[in-house]
Design a protein with these regions (language model features):
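Active-site proximal beta-strand in glycosyltransferases
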Residues: 66, 167-185
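A short, glycine/small-residue-rich beta-strand->loop->alpha-helix junction that serves as a flexible
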Residues: 69-82
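N-terminal strand-loop element at the rim of the active site
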Residues: 4-21, 73-74, 92-130
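A short, active-site helix/loop in glycosyltransferases that binds the activated sugar's phosphate group
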Residues: 17-28, 205-223
């Protein structure tokens, strides 16, 4: 028997890890309808919410930075990211970082990440069919739940779209936006180029800081 589709509910920002644990169980035996849904993660009693598995996989309640990247393999972009992460580890070892990878389940360079970085492959935790809406909801909840104030997009198209579709949310919750758009990579089309460059300042015009080049962003973190 196929599980019914899950409807995502707004997540209260003060939800406890104990409640996340409770909602992580795979099956429930009760059919009681819940009326007070403020802290309920999912409607259907058969399916746990994808977000719950991700949140419980992170060992800390609070993080400083979330980095989003499409893939994490062994290419030039991945090498650049590793260098930045190692530099941050050396200069600001107390910063806690979530590296969120959209595609794949593991990578050959996973073991090279500094201790300050917790790695999440989205596909290892998402049982639902992937959609931009689902990604937006997961990213919003991670930011609120873990009190993240720095969003660093490392050449990830889905995060460009997130900044456009959830502009009000990120103005309210994110203090620093960092964009890495590797100069040797070309966007797939003009729309992506616009999201990466031309439209970005309009999306984040109310941010505390607007940082769109690599060196300035690193200098900000180090100071």
């Amino acid at each position: 028997q196929k599980n019914k589709k899950t409807t995502l509910l707004p997540l209260h920002e003060n939800i406890s890890r104990d409640l996340l644990d409770l909602n992580a169980i795979e099956y429930r035996i009760t059919s009681t309808k819940v009326e007070n849904t403020e802290n309920v993660i999912f409607h259907n009693k058969l399916i746990p919410n994808d977000y719950v598995r991700i949140a419980l996989a992170l060992p800390y309640d609070g993080y400083d930075i979330i980095i989003t990247i499409k893939t994490f393999r062994t290419g030039g972009t991945d090498k650049l990211l590793l260098r930045y992460l190692k530099g941050i580890q050396q200069s600001q070892p107390e910063l806690r970082i979530v590296l969120l990878v959209l595609e794949g389940h593991h990578g050959d360079w996973d073991y090279l990440l500094p201790d300050s970085v917790d790695l999440i492959y989205l596909k290892n935790y998402c049982y639902q069919t992937y959609s931009q809406q689902l990604y937006n909801q997961i990213l919003e909840r991670l930011i609120v739940q873990h009190h993240i104030k720095i969003l660093w997009n490392f050449n990830c198209r889905e995060t460009y779209i997130f900044t456009e579709q959830c502009a009000d949310f990120i103005r309210e919750n994110i203090e620093v936006w960092g964009l890495i758009f590797a100069h040797w990579l070309r966007p797939n089309n003009l729309q992506e180029f616009g999201m990466a460059h031309e439209n970005l300042p309009f999306v984040i015009q109310d941010y505390t800081k607007i940082i769109s080049d690599n060196q300035t962003f690193i200098n900000y973190l180090c100071n």
